[in-house]
Amino acid sequence: FIAFIHFGPNTFTRMEWGNGMEDPRIFDLKNLDTDQWCAAMKEAGMTKVILTAKHHDGFVLWQSRYTQHGIMSSGFQDGKGDIMKELSASCQKYGLKLGIYLSPADLYQIESPEGLYGNLSKYTKRTIPKEVPGRPFANKTTFEFELDDYNEYFMSQLFELLTEYGPIDEVWFDGAHPK
């Protein structure tokens, strides 16, 4: 018995899907109490919660190094909020497992005229995570892959989530192609 939380700009637009061009300020979250969420889940007998950390619109619910399309550009806690961090702490406090839903589709990152994600760059050897000046990782593990620009971005976001938010019990990949 698990909880699945789909929470993002669509919470405020009342649309089923976003298009990746929503103004992040539309995410007008005033209060967040993940302890209340987890206490209610625990009382209901749930053992795990999966959070949609990023849906197809590309809006992220954590302080990612790799995009500005997320809570860092919203008014939530003056752009300093981190829903993943708060939920992870609450899950640990209440003994719940935490899973993440991370969409490989990202409508905010469409750059090619064919409507594909990214810029159709060539596959080259890349190190994951991609370094970002001033934002080092505590975890010094790196991986090398043959990737294009978009997949370097996606894999670096996945690395953030798997190394900075405590135990992650499940990763749910889902996707949709714009064509």
What are these regions (language model features)?
Residues 1-179:
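Mature catalytic domains of secreted/periplasmic carbohydrate-active enzymes
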